[in-house]
C-alpha cells in the first residue's frame, strides 16, 4: 500500500541545487578578480591565465563584458570564465560554426571542447560507393 505522504512526495517538484565550482557559486566567482579565479582552476588553465591572454583573447573578453550575447570566434583555446556563463558562442570547428551556450558546468573548460572537429562516420553496407577503399570490391 502507498501512503498519502509518498503520493504527495511524488508530486512535489524536484529542488534543483545551485551549481558550485569548488564551493563557490557562479555569482560569487563573478565578483572575484582574474587571479583569484585562476587559483580555483586546474593547473593547465591556471598557467594560461597567469601567463596572460593574447590580444585576441582580450578582445573576446571585452566583447563578453560589453554585454554581447552571441559571439563568433575561432579561439578554441579560450578558457570559459565565470563572466562568460549565459553567452552563446559560435565556435568554428574547421568547417562550420557550432553554436554553444555556456552553462555554469563549463567553467574551466576550453571552448574547443564543445565544438568537435571530427565526427564518427557510419557507412552503409560494403560495396561500390560505400567508402573510397571499397570502390574496387569485385561484384558478385
Swiss-Prot record:
Keywords attached to this entry: Ribonucleoprotein, Ribosomal protein, RNA-binding, rRNA-binding
GO MF annotation list: rRNA binding; structural constituent of ribosome
Biological process, per Gene Ontology: ribosomal small subunit assembly; translation
A Pfam match: Ribosomal_S19
Taxonomy, superkingdom: Archaea
Task performed by this protein: Protein S19 forms a complex with S13 that binds strongly to the 16S ribosomal RNA.
Family: Belongs to the universal ribosomal protein uS19 family.
Protein name as catalogued: Small ribosomal subunit protein uS19
Organism: Methanocella arvoryzae (strain DSM 22066 / NBRC 105507 / MRE50)
